[in-house]
Regions:
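Short beta->alpha linker loops
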Residues: 43, 72-73, 110-114, 136, ...
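Hydrophobic h-region of N-terminal signal peptides that target proteins for export
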Residues: 11-18
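Short, conserved structural micro-motifs that define repeat-unit consensus positions
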Residues: 123, 128-130, 177
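Conserved phosphate-coupling serine/threonine residues in phosphotransfer and NTP-handling enzymes
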Residues: 36, 134-136
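Sec-dependent signal peptide recognition
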Residues: 2-10
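N-terminal helical cap/lid subdomain that shapes the substrate entry/recognition surface
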Residues: 23-120, 124
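Asp-based, Mg2+/Mn2+-dependent phosphohydrolase catalytic module
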Residues: 18, 22-26, 120, 137-251
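Conserved SAM-binding loop
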Residues: 37, 111, 130, 193-194
């Protein structure tokens, strides 16, 4: 085979690879943090329960109530609990009581099962850009990621946290995901968004993303399935585990 022919074949192969990559409809993946990337949501519920037991009015901190605050900005969730349970603490005092429990638990939090394998494949095999979009503020986010810095540095391009001034409204408004897509340099319809909370999934659906993946607990699974969205424009996938993700959705 002549050198000229080898060059022609190489150019052809490169063009085929470029065409295949450019035709992939999904170019980016955006992940919520608490309860999606990291197993932290249950820790927040435990902290809430401890403070409610000590200072509340006797009402139950049940699953219906948790659905209302999961995924929402912390300022909303904390105020809601203070008002609902008639807790005679300021916002700072309430958060301080929770932090007494969380300060030792949060830095030891683990990734959700199967998520590190997923992000690695999305980034390094499928060539997607990855972002974290969390309602939590940067200082608490950094604490949660204390033992996961190498993973985040290797797989993620962008991180959006709750104090970002471009976020006008918290979840279920789509603002935080739209900011993440913008910073990744992609359109919302070129994104797949992963969430575990009803508020978060509704926010993701409101972006017009092509695919939204919900990973709910059993209690909210049916609620999540019935969330309003444009079924022609957006595919809503409800999974029990990241291990169940179908990579053919990316094509």
């Amino acid at each position: 085979m002549t050198s000229f022919l080898k060059v022609i074949i190489l150019i052809f192969m490169l063009n085929c690879a470029f065409t295949q990559e450019s035709n992939q409809k999904i170019k980016a993946a955006i992940f919520d943090l608490d309860g999606t990337l990291l197993d932290t949501q249950r820790l927040y519920d435990e902290a809430n329960q401890i403070v409610i037991n000590q200072y509340g009015n006797g009402k139950k901190y049940d699953a219906d109530l948790q659905v209302k605050i999961h995924g929402a900005p912390p300022s909303f969730g904390n105020k809601y609990l203070i008002d609902y349970f008639e807790i005679k603490l300021t916002m700072d005092e309430f958060m301080g009581k929770k932090d007494e429990y969380l300060k030792e638990k949060i830095p030891q939090c683990k990734p959700m099962e199967g998520v590190k394998e997923l992000t690695h494949l999305l980034k390094h095999k499928y060539g997607l850009k990855l972002a974290i979009a969390t309602s939590a503020f940067k200082n608490s986010t950094d604490i949660k990621l204390t033992n996961h810095k190498d993973w985040i540095k290797e797989d993620f391009d962008v991180m959006i946290t709750g104090e970002d001034k471009r976020i006008m409204k918290g979840k279920p408004s789509p603002d935080i995901f739209l900011v993440a897509a913008n910073d990744l340099g992609v359109k919302p319809e070129e994104c797949i968004i992963f969430e575990d909370a009803v508020n978060g999934v509704q926010a993701a659906l409101n972006t017009g993303a092509t695919i939204v993946v919900g990973l709910p607990d059993n209690y909210v699974k049916n609620i999540m399935k019935d969330l309003p969205h444009d079924e022609i424009r957006t595919t809503l996938c409800i999974l029990d585990s990241f291990k169940d993700f179908d990579y053919s959705l990316l094509k």
